[in-house]
């Protein structure tokens, strides 16, 4: 069940409030399986059927914009859902992204196609997506939260949201808050 059942005229409903399922293949890549396409506030979908009776690893992407009140996953009566057997994506030392609606996944056709999710699959590394639609304004409280993450790299993409004045006032302090706790970790700035 979706929280708001929002519809955006510039983005697909699958991207806004749908689900994407990926499967880990023997060639060590995540492969798209199917999407749950929303039809309203309450939805029911069969994403995959007629599966071979063997264990596989799956990754489910949640909606990019609309939240979920609840999510129930049904499986065949003989099937089980267990903890992953593989550590993919690798959760240790994630990539942390901070930025705009574009970073959040704005206008991606489906959840798995948000660029941070594509990067996560390609690198097999967890990506923490702190994309705030219209609100990447270099709030120093956000920098403090970001600095608490033991990341492999920080990617800062705030230019489309922050004004020149906000950047002059806050950018260096925002950077220094993160840098003070992570003196040797790369911090990448994305320009407009």
Language model segments and positions:
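Short acidic-hydrophobic sequence patches enriched in Asp/Glu that either
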Residues: 13, 111, 115, 170
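A generic structural signal for short coil/turn motifs at secondary-structure boundaries
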Residues: 7, 104-107, 162-165
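N-terminal secretory targeting modules
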Residues: 1-94
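Serine-esterase "nucleophile elbow" of acetyl-processing enzymes
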Residues: 51-52, 58-136, 140-147
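Short C-terminal domain-edge/linker segments immediately following a structured domain
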Residues: 27-30, 89-95, 126-130, 161, ...
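Short loop/turn segments at strand-loop or loop-helix junctions that form parts
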Residues: 2, 98-99, 156-159
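Alpha-helical cap/lid subdomain in secreted, periplasmic
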Residues: 132-192
